[in-house]
C-alpha cells in the first residue's frame, strides 16, 4: 500500500533499517504477533503469479530454517527467524523466493544479506491472515512417515518450549498465554505510537487501563514499530472472560484517540511511566 512505500522510499532492497516492516500488509498486527508473541501457529499465504501453490506461514520451522518445501511441494515460510538485513520483510521475501524454486523435500539456508529485491508486500496477494494456533509443532511432519533424527530432535525441543496460548476473538492480535503459574494478555495495537501513548496515559490516569478484577497492566513493549501492552492476570483467568473487557478498552482507546488534547501534568507523568516500562523487541 501507499503507506509502506511512503515510509520506506525507493530502496526496497537496501539495508536501511525499516521500523515497521509489516506496514502495508493486511493484518500488520497479526504478523507482529506471530513473530513476537505466538509460539506455534500457521496461516496460508497466496503468492502473486503462483496462486495455485500451497504456501503456509509458520511461526517456527525445524532447526530455525527460514523456509522449507515438503515432499508434496507445500512451501513453509518461517517467521521467527533472525533478521539478516535491516528490513525483515525483504529477508522473508528472499527466503520465500528461494523456497518457491527449491526441490520438494529441501530446506532453504540463508547465505549473507538478501540484497535488493521484492518485499512481502510485493509478493503476496492482499488478504487477511487466517491464523490457526497449534498445541505443538507436529504440523512440521504431518504426513511424513519417519522424520529424520535432526528434525525429530528439533521438534521435541520446540514442543517442550510451547507456552499455552489462545487468541481472543473480539479484537485483532490479542493473545492470552499461561507461563507456569502466571497468565498474561499481550495485545499488538495498530495505532501510531505517539498518539497511542497519549491515549494510554489519559486512560491510565482515569483508571481506564484495567480489564476488570485483579488484572493488572504492567507495561508495554515495542515490536516492529508497534506497541504491545501486557497485562498480568490472576491464575485461572483463561481467555474467554477477557473478551468483553478488551472490547470495552478498545472503545475507550478509540474515544481518546479521536479527541486528542494536550496532556495534563499528571497525564504527562503517566506517559513517562509508560515509556519507562517499555522494552523493544526486533
Cite the ranges covered by each PLM segment:
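Alpha-helical oligomerization segments
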Residues: 214-282
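A short acidic-to-branched-hydrophobic micro-motif
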Residues: 179-198
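Secondary-structure transition/turn motif
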Residues: 78-86, 189-192, 233-235
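Long, contiguous binding/interaction regions
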Residues: 37, 163, 279-282
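Surface-exposed beta-loop interaction hotspot
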Residues: 105-179
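Short acidic, Pro/Gly- and aromatic-enriched capping/linker segments at domain boundaries
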Residues: 200-219
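A short, cysteine/histidine-rich metal-binding "knuckle" motif
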Residues: 1-13
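N-terminal membrane-targeting/anchoring modules of bacterial envelope and secretion proteins
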Residues: 11-139
